[in-house]
UniProtKB/Swiss-Prot annotation:
Localization, UniProt: Nucleus; Cytoplasm, Cytoskeleton, Spindle; Chromosome, Centromere, Kinetochore; Cytoplasm, Cytoskeleton
Coiled-coil segments on the chain, per record: 75-130
An example Gene Ontology biological process: protein transport along microtubule to mitotic spindle pole body
Ranges where the record places region Disordered: 118-282
Function field: Component of the DASH complex that connects microtubules with kinetochores and couples microtubule depolymerisation to chromosome movement; it is involved in retrieving kinetochores to the spindle poles before their re-orientation on the spindle in early mitosis and allows microtubule depolymerization to pull chromosomes apart and resist detachment during anaphase.
Homology family: Belongs to the DASH complex DUO1 family.
UniProt biased composition (Polar residues): 169-189, 207-232, 265-274
Protein name from the UniProt record: DASH complex subunit duo1
Keywords for this protein: Cell cycle, Cell division, Centromere, Chromosome, Chromosome partition, Coiled coil, Cytoplasm, Cytoskeleton, Kinetochore, Microtubule, Mitosis, Nucleus
Major place of residence: nucleus
GO cellular component, one term: cytoplasm
Gene behind the chain: duo1
Origin species: Schizosaccharomyces pombe (strain 972 / ATCC 24843)
Amino acid sequence: MTSELQQELQILRSFNYTIEKLTDGLSASKEKIKSFETSINNSNRLIQLWSSVLSQTEHTQNLILNSDWKGLSFDNEELERLQHQKMLQIQAEEQRKIELQQEQERLEQERRQKEEAIALQKQQQQRLLRSKDPKVRPARRAASSYVPSRPSHVPRSSSMNVRSRVSMATTSNPNSLRTPSSSFASHRQSAIPKSATSSAPTIPTSNLPSVASSIPNNGLNSSNRKSIISKTSSRLRPPSRVSNVPSVPQHPSTRSRTSTRETTQPPFTTNPSNRSKRTTLR
């Protein structure tokens, strides 16, 4: 048993010795491989240098053989030109972007202006439709087309009485028609209300029957004639003291005529005898 174990021990020792030699050989080969790697790198650098020298030699030969080559200075200028051209291209690209942005802003502004114009046009159309609305138009027509038939301070009864008296005088004596200035003056005098002349002295009405007898009947009864006489007596009052009453505008030429006609020719005179009677009353 012991002999067998010793034999096996000897075999293992021989294996160990062989392995140690193998490891020593591998370590030696490692160092050799490193040196081989270094030599390969050096040879690679030499090959690259040689290839660059060959390429430069070939390029120089081509330049020498090229008849269009103008020298190194021209090559430098050409290189600068290419760089400047590249810079211009970059600037043109930036300018194009800026112009595109400005064009978009302009289109946006035009679109907003069109929208504002359309909105304004719609507002104007709505205003026109409101102005043409039948609920609003009658009131405006009434306000614009209304013309007063007489001044606001003139009573309706006075204007009607003036018309009736003028028509009576015209039918009784067509030759006794007054001029437009005198009729305008009489209408102005009749436009003054009785309250404005209340402070003026009144004329006694003792001689009024003679005036009534001078006015033709023309189908009027005694009550109508008395009302006309009372109204004519109120019209004979001098309108000298008039206060706080707006007067009717009168042309300057007709103003002078009115004053002379009122003093010389009383209204509704039909003959000289009546004129003398009216003068006596005054």
